[in-house]
Structure formats: structure tokens, C-alpha cells
Amino acid sequence: MARPNEADRGTDRALADLERRINSVYSQAAKELQEEIDAFFKHFADQDKKMQDLIGQKRNGKEWTEKDYQQWRLNQMGRGARLEALRDKLAERATEAKEVALAYVNDATPEIYSLNRNYTAYTIESVHPSADFTLFDEQTVKRLIVEQPDVMPYYPERLALKRGIDLAFGKQQITASVTGSILQGRSIKQISDDLQSRIVTMSRVSAIRAARTAVTAAQNAGRMDSYAAADEMWGIKSKKKWVATKDLRTRHDHGMADNQIVDYDQPFDVGGYKMMFPGDGSLGAPGHELYNCRCTVVNATDDDLEAERHMMRVKNPETGEYELVKKKSYKEWYDEKKAQY
């Protein structure tokens, strides 16, 4: 089994930081939303208690029943201008939180991409001394996205908020939450708690899922683009291997693809769908094969490349001759590369 390397560990740290930032955004949103929800239901609290206490009593010559009380609640809390105003405000705030979260994701992916592209370049140079990659950094990636996107053919698209769809879905969920809670006879506190949980948790889970999916795509795209560059510039043909996370959360199709090896420019067969790498939807793989994926693609010989201190051939910058030396660590290789600029 491929062991986690420095690129894997760096990617995991970046994802953990990203999730912390997203959770912080939603914690603040939850606090603000709770204030709006509390204000809305406080308006009804006293009257709601009075109407509930009337059950079994005569009102306007007719016995006031549980059904009458439920209908009153629907008319007062489940419909009308007040609910619409609350619905619109909550949906807008949740959408704003998701917009910030996606901006965080888009800001993080260049660093994740460059880390994995550079690390893969290091593994290739370790066994192919003729290769001489140029280092990528976050700013280089951001510039190339605009100026030379063809240099990074596998770089994932930016995540974009579908504002209209998100708003409409949020409003629908809010209305359904209030109406459903009333029909189930929940107390005002229970209605309030369910509404807060549904709107915030639903949006936060969606944002975290988008972050994990985007990080996986950027991680593996960086590796793929190094394979492609090695072939284009030095004729080095790499084979790639699908590596699935070994636990019970891994979906069946991805577990079955584990250790599948193909040429770097050929797709994997994952559950009958073609994918160039984990997180790749360019060949038509559906969302259920992409979302929350934790798989990675590695060079098919990465198990050998990652072993401690193999010998490697490098060019002596003073003599121009190739020499056999102990394999450099990634940090040593990176520092030497950086010193060349």
C-alpha cells in the first residue's frame, strides 16, 4: 500500500485548515440566524400558549380542538408575510456564508495544486535525471490560470455559487421545516431548533463536501500535469495507479479501483465510468463518484520512489556530468531547485 508522502500530508493539512475556516464562517452565520429565528418565534410565543390552552374549551360556540389549534398555527406561523420575510433573510444569509466558503476553497486550490505538481516532479527527477522541472508556486498557478491555462490542462474549474438555485432551495427547506414541525405538533423551541439545524447544517455540509471534492481534484490534477509535462518535454512515459483510502467509508466503486494501473494519459475504469484521476468529472463521471472522494493517483512506481534513500543520478551543475548520489529528500530537492531561480 502506498504510504502517505509529503504531498499527501501537506494536502491533508491544507484541507483541515480549509474546513476550520468554513466551520468558522458557518458558526458566525448560525449565531446571526438564531437571533432572527428567536425574534420571529418570540412574536408568536404568548399567543401560541393561549391558543394551546383553549383545546377542549368552547370558542365561538364550538369546541376548540387539536386540529383547530394546528390550523391556527399554520395560518399564523406557517404562512404570510412574516414567514416570507424570515425565509428570505435566512436563505440569503446561508447563501452568503456558502459564497464565502467557496471563495476560501478557490483561494486554497492553487497551493494544493502546486504542492502536488512539485512533489510529483521530484519523484520523476529522482529516477529520470534528464528531467528538469520548473517549480510552481501559488502565484504562478494563479497567473497561469489566466494567461496560459493550457500549461495546466487538468487544473479543476473554479467553484461557482449558483445563487438562484441555492436561494430557491434554501427558501424551500425553510418553509418545509416550519410547516413540517407545525404538523408534527412540535413546540416553538423545537420548531426553532429544527429550523436552525436544517438551514445551517445543510449549507455547511454542502460547503464542506465541495471543499473536499475540490481539494481532491486539485491534488490529483497537479500530479497529472507533471506526468503530462514529463512526457511532452522529455518523452518520459509514466504509469499511474489509483489508490483508495482503506476504511469502511470508501465507496465500493473506488475500493474496486484500488491499485488499478494505466498509462498516465488513459482513464481509469471506476464503476464503469471513465476518470482520469480521483475527482475528475471531465469524461462524464457522475457526482456520486466525485463528491467527498479521498482517493489519490500516484506514479505506479511510487512505492519504490518513496523508499528511504535510494540512489539517484543527478547532473553536477559545475561539471555537467551525471553522478550517482543518495536520493535527496523532497525538501533538499525543493531547496536546490529554488536556489536556481
Task: Give the positions of each predicted feature.
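Acidic, glycine-rich two-metal-ion catalytic cores of nucleic acid-processing enzymes
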Residues: 205-310
